[in-house]
C-alpha cells in the first residue's frame, strides 16, 4: 500500500526527492470532465494553485522550482483540453458546445516552445490542446479530423520543432490506423514539416507496409483451410461474390 510514504531520502537531492514523493500533487481526472464547464475550470485552477502552494512551501532550489512550475502546469491541466468531448460522453448532453471562455483559458495554457519537449507532461498535453483548439468555431465535424488538426498546426505553430513533433504524431497515427487511401494531403503536410531522419525512416517504413493495401492493388495470393478443412485459394474465389465477416476473437460470428 503506502510504503512509499515512509521512505526517507538523504544526500544533496533529499529535499527534492521528498517533495516528489509526498503524493500531495493533484491533477484533473477523467471523472472531473463531467463537471459543468465553469466548475471544471474552477477546479482545475484550484488544483494548480494548491500544487504551486505546495511547491513554494517546499522551498527548493530555484533551478528545480522553475522547471517544476512548468511541469506542474501540464500535469495538473492534463485532462483540460478533453473537457468538451468527455463532458458530452459522460453526461450524454450532445448539445454541449465549448464556450469562448473555455477556449481562452485553454489558449492561455499553451506555450509553444521546443525546449519543453523534454517534459513528458508537455508532450502529452500539447497534442490534445491543439486538437481541441482546432475545433473552435467548427460547426460540422470534418470527414478526417486529423486534416483539421494538421491544418491548424500549419497555420498557427511557428516553432519548427514543435510543429514537426505534432505533425509526425498526428499523421503517423492516422495512417497507422486508416492506411494511405485519401491521405495525400496529410502526407504532403508531413513532408513539409517533418525533417528528422528517424521520424522520416519510421514513416516511410509504415507507408511501404500500407502500400500493399491501397485500393486497386492486387491482393497477394493465399491458400487457407475452410471450416471443413478443405483448402481454399484466392484463385478459387475469382469471379464469385465474397462476403467477409470480420469479428473479434472473443465473440462468436455476428
State where each predicted segment sits:
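Short amphipathic alpha-helix with an adjacent loop that forms part of the alpha/beta core around
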Residues: 233-237
Amino acid at each position: 500500500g503506502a510504503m512509499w510514504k515512509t521512505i526517507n531520502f538523504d544526500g544533496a537531492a533529499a529535499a527534492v526527492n521528498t517533495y516528489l514523493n509526498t503524493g500531495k500533487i493533484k491533477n484533473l481526472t477523467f471523472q472531473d470532465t463531467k463537471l459543468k464547464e465553469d466548475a471544471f475550470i474552477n477546479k482545475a485552477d484550484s488544483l494548480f494553485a494548491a500544487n504551486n502552494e505546495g511547491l513554494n512551501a517546499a522551498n527548493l532550489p530555484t533551478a528545480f522550482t522553475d522547471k517544476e512550475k512548468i511541469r506542474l502546469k501540464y500535469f495538473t491541466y492534463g485532462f483540460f483540453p478533453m473537457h468538451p468531448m468527455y463532458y458530452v460522453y459522460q453526461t450524454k448532453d450532445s448539445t454541449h458546445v465549448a464556450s469562448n471562455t473555455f477556449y481562452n483559458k485553454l489558449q492561455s495554457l499553451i506555450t509553444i516552445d521546443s525546449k519543453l519537449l523534454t517534459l513528458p507532461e508537455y508532450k502529452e498535453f500539447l497534442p490534445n490542446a491543439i486538437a481541441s483548439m482546432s475545433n473552435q468555431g467548427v460547426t460540422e465535424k470534418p470527414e478526417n479530423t486529423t486534416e483539421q488538426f494538421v491544418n491548424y498546426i500549419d497555420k498557427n505553430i511557428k516553432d519548427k520543432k514543435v510543429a514537426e513533433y505534432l505533425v509526425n504524431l498526428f499523421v503517423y497515427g492516422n495512417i497507422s490506423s486508416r492506411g494511405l487511401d485519401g491521405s495525400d494531403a496529410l502526407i504532403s503536410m508531413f513532408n513539409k514539416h517533418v525533417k528528422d531522419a528517424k521520424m522520416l525512416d519510421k514513416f516511410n517504413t509504415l507507408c511501404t507496409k500500407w502500400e500493399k493495401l491501397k485500393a486497386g492493388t492486387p491482393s497477394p495470393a493465399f491458400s487457407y483451410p475452410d471450416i471443413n478443412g478443405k483448402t481454399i485459394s484466392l484463385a478459387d474465389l475469382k469471379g464469385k461474390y465474397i462476403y467477409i465477416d470480420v469479428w473479434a476473437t472473443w465473440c462468436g460470428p455476428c
